[in-house]
């Protein structure tokens, strides 16, 4: 009963059913988990395999997303199972999902989507509860995602790394922490709370000096440390993201011989388990690992394992699991074996453990597959180097042959081949080391029947001839080797040392021409004696001829002539014909189907067929987008290739070459890469230029496997590079499929990433389909083929022939060494070995002759010595060659000259080497480390090891300082100019704000000027009465009030000075802004840039250098002092020694030596001079006598050894020559002794100070001694005793004085030494802090350089806005100046017009009876000639309409329009007065024309200023936006800078952060604050208090002034009220009512008011009648418009109906037109005419509508001008 059925489409369901999946992917890391005590789970291809550990039975859980299964994880409760899958890319793909299954029910509980783009590579549940699931994606995103899987929600996500991640695990001890590891990295994660929320923060482990390694396994220890594996076999202990210690075995051996693939912590047993590629599981003491500390001289620690269990010798272990009780392990190796290790209850684990192999499965990528023609047996070649015989129905491994090298090529041998013993299954395999092997299946397994190393590199392809008699092997080194396959091993080649190759008989090899590429596949030509056709990775087919049978290969297998005989054929395929897209839906879909495949292929990837498809929208949108893309690609391809359908050569690799059985000379070819050639299988005829398409391939990946089955090859089996398998029925044998035929069956059986199909085959009875791929899986499917496609019954029923040992040829010696010679190298080496053997034999014979001659000569010498002295021959007569001595002396001289030259060369070499070392180690140093000892005690102080500041650093520092100074100067200059400009702008702005606009303050000031001028003129002329003067005075007062009120600011006005003061106070408040505040924005002057940071770093580096250099100067000065002190002390000690001698002489019987020792004892420990470590440079250059003596001894020893060797080499012939040389060696001794004595003598100079005294004591003569004894016997007199006592006291005084002086000198030096040491300690701390600050600065500099580009863009934007603003401000200022000038001029003009009016009042007083008529004449507007500055002709007249439009006087006087009548002097009026009024009118009109012109100019300037102000507001808004972006950017930059960790050393008294009176364990929330800043803030508080007190006093004074002003205001208001009351009382008393003075003025000044009222009434009646007439006309036109609108609507409806009818008629005509004659030209012409008529009708109606609308608008206007 099949476990599952794969139905690829509903049409073809039931064709194939999956029965089993053989293989185990043990090469994938972390791919084995325990579900329960008896079940393990592993992923392979698209299945999750459930393996029973007790029976070896397998169950399968199929994948759901079609791309394979990527990872698996088990819930801590073992009731749930998480499976992360892979999804094939495409528009319909929703991406891979993580499915949560229940166990053991295997039902889907939850589905997690959106965690990665293509595939999952690792999964893990957290802790004991398992509430959180961690998933890691594969290429291209590598996303680490944390899931709340119960809610199917993503909690956090981050990119794990940029390379493959092998595993992920939560910390079992610390919540919120997890670890990932993979290719070249390990990363430690924690869920951290930041100011933007919860985030995943990952710290990458830094390998430092340890070699970078892939981390396949890791385990976390309880204290947070992590133990990880390496590729080299060591264990790394991580602590805080750094390697704490590297663990090795004793002897610096790695923990395992090979990579460590699994780690396990057995906490109850207190041990750590590790499994490696050496087949062993080693146990390590947990305590020793956890507490491991590195040695002082190394970063490693040697540990001995507690025990080890040998699982399997030579097995590369890949997984290690332990059951819940910890008493059984489950182990897997890379060969596909699964073991259980039962641990003993007590005693040593290594001895008591029982290892049981549970199951053996094929593992590793499958390189080839061969199915038996008789039984259900297959030969499977795995890439791990193992060839297996497999019963694919039961899954049992029948036999296997393993080699240490990978299998890179595979081909089966036909049963008729001579190399198949007894017709048994035989296959040829090629390996990575260039070896070709033949294996035949026999009764005992797989027998090796042939082996030969043909190539230096890997074997790329193998091909066997149709008759099975020849084999060709192509290697990656560009060589092609031909073998003959024989039934029996061939005899040797006759060359000794050549190995036997079994059934492989080497024939010859050729080298391919350069540029041919690497061979990927091959096939033999069908013709008898034909050569080989080889496909390459460059898309070419090479025709290689067969070497001739008579080729001489005695000296070499190479056939040099064959290289030039190789011919090449380029695979050229026709370009696909892309059909043009039609608008119809069905046609569009077909076009998408046909052309879309090509487009998808162009975007695909070679490996795995992966595609980077974007997320599409709806189906229709996707189709439209693809159609547009296809059209664009078609156009581009047509332009590039000259049109679709042209030839196209492929540059991808050729994957397979097969002879077409039904057509001699034709090849079936499949190609890789991308493009059209990889989409199909092709039929290639070598004589034709183009290949013909044979079968449609796959849209996502190239065809990698092509086979035929069924009767006459009518069934094609295809496999793709991304794991798809297809069965295709063919229309003809070995031909193509029927047009439009769909696949018989197709399924994604293998992994989409690593599942390149490498083998397909039907069983001999057609009941099964077997597939193999690079993912290591072998799928067995039951087939239910149609009868016409089922293969015929087998003609060879029965069991597989298995020959016994007797029927097999002798096993040839296998080639296992990686450095073994190839066949060609073996042949060449064999000849060289033969020549070496002959030379050695010849040398041995010569040595034997020499030995006989030497023995004969020694016998003659002995006989001569035994003869009587008289009969003895002199030794000279026994010299064999008398000229030998002269030859030897000449040879000695020659060798001496050679030695001299060699010595000179060696001396120069040593000098250059020393100079190079000096240049490398010392030239860059300004001062090296020097130690200075104190004179008393063991205190030492050292210098700073200071490197010179490089010239580049100094130049960069100088340039940056110069740039900083230039920038500061430019900024100061810009600030000065900006301040002046700002003040000017503020002043102008203030004037503009308080002055109002032209219609406000300007008009008020103009009225004030007019009123003032009129009043002054009237007063001066004396012609006005008092009423007129009072009226003019009131107008002036009103104008003054208006002007005053115009200058009053509104309630929203803010003084610029106040705003500037507030901003200055806010800026200089003196508070301390915390940079950790998320809203903190760094001030402009404090913002860091890469240049500022680099300058600060350089200045800090220079300061550190200067500090160290200054200290070193003090140090060397103190060293000079020590040298001088020691010199002075030596002098004083010599004086003390003389005093000791004098004291001994004074005391008489005292021992002088004892006295000197007593005197010098306090200073016995003083050095005689500076020590070598105190003068390293001088000591390095100095060569002492001891060094010379040691060198002489070494040289003598070398000469002795050389002489001994020379004497031994010459044998007995050197006896006479060696004798006279012996005394010379002995004669060298006196010279050496003299040198030593000289050295000793020179060494005694230091103690020469005491020499004279001792010499005096030892140099007494006998008489002096007798005299001394005699004097000693004579008793001393009192004088002598007194003199002796005086001498003793004098000596003691001098001794104490000298001792005190020496002690004072020593103490002074030691005090200076102590002070210098204390200073060094402080400076060293400062220097280290500065160096740490440099490191922090470097990190900040890197961040600043990352942000610099964005900041530059923002600064450029802001500067552009500032420039625009400044330009606008300048324009506004210029415009304001112009306005002010125009206003002043306007006021003058208004005053001049007022003077004209006042002159009129003087000419025509109020009492004049003709005043009203003359005033009307004065104010009348007349047509005047336009005055032009240049004179000349032209149109001088203009209409008074322009005056009416351009002027608006706004006066209260009557403004009569010219009625067109003739103007005459009023009857009875004086003609001179009339003419004078006309002249004044002309003056008034001139002034009003100028006023109108100035008013127009002022209005233009005002509008221009308003436009500029509006533009300024827009620019300021843009500047504010840029400043906001800059502030956000600065916040982001400061946030990143805040993340840089800074080390601050604090003492306990500096920590003032207590919780409940105790220091908390976590200080992450505390704030580190500078004491200087704290003091500054405290001082600033005092300053602010003082400022507040001053401001309060100023405020109090202002309030007092304000109160005084209020009192003055109240007094003035009371005075005004008093005056108003008095005026009211006076008016009531005189007139009985309050007089309205303005009304009185108007009444008194307008005598014709009643007349004007009558005229006004008449005009109103006339205008009312005219208005009524126009309203009637408008109503009539409106009715007409409604009628026309309805008619137009009816026409439009008719047009719409006619258009619909036309379309229906066209559809009917189109449907019934097939077969009828129709003239398309006439139809087209009729359609055009009808459409033109409709367009003309619509245009006419639109024109009529526009005309009616225009009439309506004209009728609606009430201000229609008579001049219009």
From Swiss-Prot:
Keywords for this protein: Cell projection, Cilium, Coiled coil, Cytoplasm, Cytoskeleton, Flagellum, Repeat, WD repeat
Pfam families xrefs: Beta-prop_EML, WD40
UniProt biased composition (Acidic residues): 629-641, 1434-1462
Residue ranges the record marks as coiled coil: 821-850, 1479-1517, 1567-1674, 1729-1758
UniProt entry tagged with the keyword Cytoplasm: yes
PROSITE patterns: WD_REPEATS_1, WD_REPEATS_2, WD_REPEATS_REGION
Cystines in this chain: none
Listed InterPro entries: Beta-prop_EML_1st (IPR055439), WD40/YVTN_repeat-like_dom_sf (IPR015943), WD40_repeat_dom_sf (IPR036322), WD40_rpt (IPR001680)
Disordered as annotated region, ranges: 570-654, 972-1003, 1426-1468
Example GO biological process: cilium-dependent cell motility
Family: Belongs to the CFAP44 family.
Protein name, UniProt field: Cilia- and flagella-associated protein 44
Taxonomy of the source species: Eukaryota, Viridiplantae, Chlorophyta, core chlorophytes, Chlorophyceae
């Amino acid at each position: 009963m099949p476990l599952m059925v794969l139905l690829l489409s509903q049409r073809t369901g039931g064709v194939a059913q999956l029965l089993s999946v053989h293989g185990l992917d043990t090469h994938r890391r972390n791919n084995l988990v325990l579900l329960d005590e008896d079940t393990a789970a592993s992923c392979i291809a698209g299945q999750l395999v459930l393996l029973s550990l007790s029976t070896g039975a397998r169950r399968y859980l199929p994948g759901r997303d079609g791309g394979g299964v990527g990872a698996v994880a088990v819930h801590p409760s073992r009731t749930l199972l998480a499976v992360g899958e892979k999804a094939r890319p495409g528009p319909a793909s929703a991406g891979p999902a993580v499915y949560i299954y229940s166990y053991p029910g295997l039902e889907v509980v939850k589905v997690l989507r959106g965690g990665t783009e293509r595939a999952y590579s690792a999964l893990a549940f957290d802790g004991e509860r398992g509430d959180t699931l961690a998933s890691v994606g594969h290429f291209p995103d590598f996303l680490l995602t944390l899931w709340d899987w119960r809610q199917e929600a993503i909690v956090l996500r981050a990119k794990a790394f940029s390379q493959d991640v092998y595993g992920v695990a939560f910390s079992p001890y610390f919540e919120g922490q997890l670890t990932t590891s993979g290719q070249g990295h390990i990363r430690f994660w924690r869920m951290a709370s930041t100011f933007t929320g919860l985030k995943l923060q990952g710290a990458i482990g830094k390998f430092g000096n340890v070699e970078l390694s892939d981390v396949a396994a890791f385990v976390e220890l309880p204290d947070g440390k992590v133990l990880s594996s390496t590729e080299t076999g060591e264990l790394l202990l991580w602590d805080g993201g750094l390697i704490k210690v590297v663990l090795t075995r004793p002897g610096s051996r790695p923990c395992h011989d090979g990579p460590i693939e699994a780690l396990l912590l057995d906490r109850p047993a207190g041990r750590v388990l590790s499994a490696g590629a050496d087949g062993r599981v080693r146990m390590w003491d947990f305590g020793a690992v956890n507490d491991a500390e590195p040695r002082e001289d190394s970063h490693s620690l040697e540990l001995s394992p507690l025990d080890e269990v040998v699982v399997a010798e030579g097995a590369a272990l890949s997984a290690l699991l332990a059951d819940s009780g910890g008493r059984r392990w489950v182990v897997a190796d890379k060969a596909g074996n699964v073991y259980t290790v039962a641990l003993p209850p007590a005693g040593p684990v290594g001895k008591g453990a029982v290892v049981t192999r549970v199951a053996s499965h094929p593992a590793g990528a499958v390189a080839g597959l061969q199915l038996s023609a008789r039984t259900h047996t297959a030969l499977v070649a795995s890439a791990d180097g193992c060839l297996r015989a497999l019963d694919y129905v039961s899954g049992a491994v029948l036999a296997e042959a393993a080699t240490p090298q990978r299998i890179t090529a595979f081909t089966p041998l036909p049963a008729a081949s001579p190399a198949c013993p007894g017709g048994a299954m035989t296959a040829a395999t090629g390996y990575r080391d260039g070896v070709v092997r033949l294996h035949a299946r026999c009764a005992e397994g797989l027998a090796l029947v042939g082996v030969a190393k043909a190539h230096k590199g890997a074997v790329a392809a193998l091909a066997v001839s149709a008759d099975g008699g020849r084999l060709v092997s192509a290697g990656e080194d560009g060589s092609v080797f031909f073998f003959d396959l024989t039934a029996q091993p061939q005899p040797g080649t006759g060359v000794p040392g050549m190995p036997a190759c079994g059934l492989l008989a080497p024939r010859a090899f050729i080298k391919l021409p350069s540029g041919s590429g690497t061979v990927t596949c091959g096939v033999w030509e069908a013709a008898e004696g034909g050569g080989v056709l080889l496909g390459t990775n460059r898309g070419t087919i090479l025709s290689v001829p067969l070497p001739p049978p008579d080729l001489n290969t005695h000296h070499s297998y190479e056939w040099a002539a064959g290289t030039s005989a190789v011919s090449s054929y380029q695979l050229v395929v026709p370009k696909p014909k892309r059909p043009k897209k039609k608008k119809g839906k069905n046609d569009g879909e077909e076009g998408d189907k046909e052309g879309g495949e090509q487009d998808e292929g162009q975007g695909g990837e070679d490996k795995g067929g992966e595609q980077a498809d974007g997320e599409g929208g709806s189906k229709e949108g996707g189709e439209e987008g693809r159609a547009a893309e296809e059209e664009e690609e078609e156009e581009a391809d047509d332009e590039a290739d000259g049109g679709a359908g042209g030839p196209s050569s492929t540059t991808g690799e050729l994957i397979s070459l097969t002879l077409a059985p039904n057509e001699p000379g034709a090849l079936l070819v499949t190609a890789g890469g991308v493009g059209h050639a990889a989409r199909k299988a092709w039929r290639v005829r070598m004589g034709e230029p183009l290949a013909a398409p044979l079968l449609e391939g796959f849209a996502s990946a190239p065809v990698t496997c092509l086979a035929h089955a069924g009767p006459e090859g009518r069934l094609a089996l295809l496999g793709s590079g991304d794991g798809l398998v297809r069965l295709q029925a063919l229309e003809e044998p070995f031909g193509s499929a029927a047009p439009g035929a769909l696949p018989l069956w197709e399924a994604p059986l293998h992994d989409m990433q690593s599942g390149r199909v490498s083998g397909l085959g039907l069983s001999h009875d057609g009941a099964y389909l077997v597939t193999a791929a690079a993912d290591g899986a072998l799928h067995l499917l039951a087939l239910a083929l149609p009868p016409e496609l089922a293969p015929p019954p087998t003609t060879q029923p029965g069991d597989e022939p298995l020959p016994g040992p007797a029927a097999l040829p002798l096993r040839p010696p296998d080639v296992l060494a990686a450095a073994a010679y190839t066949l060609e190298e073996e042949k060449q080496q064999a000849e060289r070995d033969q020549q070496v053997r002959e030379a050695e034999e010849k040398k041995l014979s010569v040595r034997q002759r020499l030995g006989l001659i030497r023995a004969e000569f020694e016998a003659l010498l002995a006989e001569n010595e035994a003869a009587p002295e008289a009969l003895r021959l002199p030794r000279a007569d026994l010299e064999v060659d008398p000229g030998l001595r002269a030859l030897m002396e000449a040879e000695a001289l020659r060798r001496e000259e050679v030695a001299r030259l060699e010595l000179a060369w060696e001396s120069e070499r040593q000098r250059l080497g020393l100079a190079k070392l000096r240049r490398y180690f010392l030239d860059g140093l300004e001062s090296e480390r020097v130690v200075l000892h104190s004179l008393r005690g063991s205190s030492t102080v050292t210098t700073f090891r200071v490197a010179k500041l490089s010239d580049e650093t100094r130049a960069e520092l100088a340039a940056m300082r110069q740039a900083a100074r230039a920038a500061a100067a430019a900024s100061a200059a810009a600030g000065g100019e900006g301040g002046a400009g700002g003040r000017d702008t503020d002043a102008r702005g203030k004037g503009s704000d308080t002055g109002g606009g032209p219609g406000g303050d300007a008009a008020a000031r103009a009225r004030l000027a007019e009123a003032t001028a009129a009043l002054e003129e009237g007063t001066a002329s004396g012609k006005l009465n008092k009423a007129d003067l009072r009226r003019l005075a009131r107008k002036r007062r009103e104008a003054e009030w208006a002007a005053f009120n115009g200058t009053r600011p509104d309630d929203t006005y803010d003084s610029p000075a106040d705003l500037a003061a507030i901003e200055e106070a806010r800026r200089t408040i003196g508070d301390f802004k915390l940079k950790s505040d998320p809203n903190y924005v760094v001030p402009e002057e404090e913002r860091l840039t890469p240049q500022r940071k680099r300058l600060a770093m350089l200045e800090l580096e220079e300061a550190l250098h200067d500090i160290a250099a200054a200290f070193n100067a003090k140090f060397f000065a103190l060293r000079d002092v020590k040298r001088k002190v020691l010199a002075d002390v030596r002098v004083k000690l010599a004086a003390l020694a003389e005093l000791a001698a004098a004291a001994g002489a004074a005391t008489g019987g005292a021992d002088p030596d004892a006295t000197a020792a007593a005197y010098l004892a306090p200073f016995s420990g003083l050095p005689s001079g500076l020590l070598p470590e105190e003068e390293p440079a001088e000591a390095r250059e100095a060569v002492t006598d001891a060094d010379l003596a040691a060198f002489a001894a070494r040289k003598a020893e070398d000469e002795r050894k050389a002489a001994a060797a020379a004497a031994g080499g010459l044998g007995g012939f050197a006896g006479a020559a060696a004798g006279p040389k012996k005394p010379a060696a002995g004669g060298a001794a006196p010279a050496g002794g003299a040198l030593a004595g000289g050295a000793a003598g020179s060494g005694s100079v230091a103690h020469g100070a005491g020499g004279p005294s001792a010499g005096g004591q030892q140099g007494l003569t006998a008489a002096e001694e007798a005299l001394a004894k005699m004097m000693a016997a004579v008793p001393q007199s009192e004088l002598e005793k007194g003199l002796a006592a005086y001498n003793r006291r004098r000596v003691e005084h001098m001794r104490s004085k000298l001792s005190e002086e020496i002690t004072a000198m020593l103490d002074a030096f030691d005090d200076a030494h102590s002070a210098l040491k204390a200073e060094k300690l402080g400076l060293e701390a400062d220097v280290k802090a500065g160096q740490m600050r440099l490191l922090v600065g470097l990190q900040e500099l890197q961040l600043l350089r990352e942000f610099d580009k964005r900041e530059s863009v923002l600064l450029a934007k802001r500067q552009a806005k500032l420039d625009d603003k400044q330009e606008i401000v300048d324009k506004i200022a210029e415009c304001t100046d112009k306005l002010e000038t125009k206003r002043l001029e306007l006021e003058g003009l208004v005053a001049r017009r007022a003077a004209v009016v006042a002159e009129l009042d003087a000419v025509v007083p109020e009492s004049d009876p003709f005043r009203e008529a003359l005033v009307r004449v004065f104010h009348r507007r007349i047509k005047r000639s336009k005055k032009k500055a240049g004179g000349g002709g032209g149109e001088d007249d203009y209409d008074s309409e322009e005056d009416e439009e351009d002027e608006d006087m706004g006066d209260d006087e009557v403004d009569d329009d010219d009625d067109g009548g003739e103007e005459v002097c009023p009857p009875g009026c004086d003609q001179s007065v009339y003419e004078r009024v006309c002249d004044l009118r002309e003056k008034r009109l001139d002034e009003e024309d100028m006023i109108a012109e100035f008013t127009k100019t002022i209005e233009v300037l005002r509008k221009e200023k308003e436009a500029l102000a509006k533009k300024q507001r827009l620019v300021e808004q843009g500047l504010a936006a840029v400043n906001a972006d800059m502030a956000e950017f600065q916040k982001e930059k400061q946030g990143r800078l805040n993340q840089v960790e800074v080390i601050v050393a604090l003492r306990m008294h500096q920590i003032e952060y207590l919780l409940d009176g105790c220091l908390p364990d976590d200080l992450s929330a505390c704030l580190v604050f500078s004491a200087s800043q704290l003091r500054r803030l405290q001082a600033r508080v005092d300053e602010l208090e003082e400022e507040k007190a001053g401001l309060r006093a100023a405020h109090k004074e202002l309030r007092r002034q304000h109160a005084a002003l209020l009192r003055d205001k109240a007094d003035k208001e009371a005075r005004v009220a008093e005056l108003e009351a008095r005026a009211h009382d006076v008016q009531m008393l005189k007139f009985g009512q309050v007089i309205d003075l303005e009304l009185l003025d108007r009444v008194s000044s307008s005598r014709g008011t009643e007349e004007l009222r009558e005229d006004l009434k008449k005009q109103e009646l006339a205008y009312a009648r005219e208005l009524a007439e126009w309203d009637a006309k408008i109503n009539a036109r409106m009715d007409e418009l409604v009628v026309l609108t309805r008619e137009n609507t009816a026409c439009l409806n008719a047009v719409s109906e006619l258009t619909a009818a036309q379309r229906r008629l066209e559809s009917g005509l189109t449907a019934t037109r097939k077969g009828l004659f129709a003239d398309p030209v006439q139809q087209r012409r009729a359609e055009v005419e009808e459409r033109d008529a409709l367009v003309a009708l619509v245009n006419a109606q639109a024109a009529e509508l526009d005309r009616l609308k225009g009439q309506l608008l004209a009728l609606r206007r009430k201000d229609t001008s008579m001049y219009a």
